[in-house]
Amino acid sequence: MAVRIKESATATLIRRLGDNSGRILAPLRRWRPIVAVGPFGLVTRADDVREVLGDHEHFTVSHYAPKMAEITGPFILGLDDTPLYRREDAALNAVIRREDLPRIVEATLAAGRERIAAAHGRIDVVAEFADPVIDRVITGYFGTPGPDTPTQLRWARNLFEHIFLNVGDKPRIRARALEDAGEMRPHLDAHIAARRAAIAAGDAVPDDVLTRLLRQPPDEGRLHDIAIRHNLIGLIAGWIPTVSKAFAVAMEELLDRPSELERAQQAASDGDQELVGAYVFEALRFRPQTWALLRICGETTTVAAGTERATEIRKGAKVLVATQSAMFDQRAVTAPHEFRVDRPWHDYVHFGSGLHTCFGLQINRVHIPALATALLEGPRISRAPGAAGKLQFDGPYPSGLGVSLAD
């Protein structure tokens, strides 16, 4: 008999599975790795997670489009493989370049070191370090400064929460996002217009993503100004909250592992950002920014066809793709319950897979380790006393994590 799951019940199920992912998903990986119950699906094994994320024809991100439309308009994070997606993806990839990575690393180190130098024996890893550094570096690179960091963070978090997390369509979350979008759109429109005027006047302008987008030749797929605004809003909303959370939860995990934290600090002191990154990304495997991604089954299809676990997923089903579970699948990951910094990058699904692999993957593979290096390279850190030393949340986002800096 089919089981009807209301949207609000789906939201509750996502939360409860997330709260108990380790206890629930391990037995599912073994005994029932693919779940299909009425309009709901869940995949838990690494091969199946990558199959679903890689099959954008059957498993779509179409559910994000209506919310994006009311916020600003379509942008690549919520587009399936269409001519619009390919055009805008090509335009953004032409201006967000691999050769920019050293510049982003240096900017991150500089901003992070300023924060540590100004601290007096204690710093909040979220509010006083990660959030202002990420905002400064990433919006500086994009060319999209907000009125101030608190406003930019509020805009990004509220928009992200409605578009990507509000599966229960709570009116309060939607209203808050629409209000903030009403502030953010004219702010960016004015900034884009001012930059375009400066370019036309021959004024000196920064070599950032916005300038590059505005200077793209028409025959190379140049985006019009409203499309530029759509995608910049999408990049800001999709970038700042997720990187901040990823950094915060990784630091929380390392603080729970004193031996690994000590070795990560030594790597930072030695200037080995690649090794620092290995500690951070391994910490994220145990405590991820998100435990699953949501996809909608566009056409009835079978996952893991030809295997004993082959399961039909119905058209319209909401499918939770359990990325954290995939990173603990012993069929794909060696010694998954050990904390190891020698893992191949393929073991990680932090940034998704397939068509909608995180657009910022290459940047974040150096930006997050640089952020960690700036925090860890100096005084030894430990939890601040009391409640301040534990990771705190404001809704879905980390809001505080105090650490003491040794003399």
Briefly describe each language-model feature range.
Residues 1-407:
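Cytochrome P450
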